[in-house]
């Protein structure tokens, strides 16, 4: 299902951040978030360039967030429709919902 090029990286800045995959010199997929309190990540947007859609890239971003939430102990509030749909498909993630 996935022929993702590159690894997921994370950038944090004051109160917000993003997960991203560099797909080409000038193309990135990203999932953006902000912190709502100390232990709640509010995911507000997921983007994959049209030329790279259908390769499992957005799913890889979400899987990385889920792994980080489990290892770092934070909850997720999915405002992004894609991430919200993924939570509906994965009831085993329910314990991570804020």
Regions found by a protein language model. Give the residues of each.
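C-terminal structural segments of small proteins and small subunits
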Residues: 64-98
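Intrinsic-disorder/low-complexity peptide segments enriched for small residues
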Residues: 29, 59, 94-95
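N-terminal first-folded block
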Residues: 2-40
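Conserved acetyl-CoA-binding loop-helix of GNAT-fold acetyltransferases
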Residues: 54-65
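Basic, gly/Ser/Thr/Pro-rich low-complexity segments located predominantly at protein N termini
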Residues: 20, 59-61, 85
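A short, internal acetyl-CoA/4′-phosphopantetheine-binding micro-motif in the GNAT/acyltransferase core
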Residues: 46-53
């Amino acid at each position: 299902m996935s022929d993702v090029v590159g690894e997921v990286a994370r950038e944090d800045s004051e109160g917000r951040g993003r997960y991203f995959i560099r797909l080409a010199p000038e193309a990135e997929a990203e999932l953006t978030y902000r912190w709502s309190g100390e232990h709640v990540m509010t995911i507000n947007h997921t983007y994959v360039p049209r030329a790279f859609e259908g390769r499992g890239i957005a799913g890889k971003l979400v899987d990385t967030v889920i792994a980080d939430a489990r290892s770092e102990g934070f909850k997720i509030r999915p405002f992004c429709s894609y991430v919200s749909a993924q939570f509906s498909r994965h009831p085993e993630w329910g314990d991570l919902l804020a």
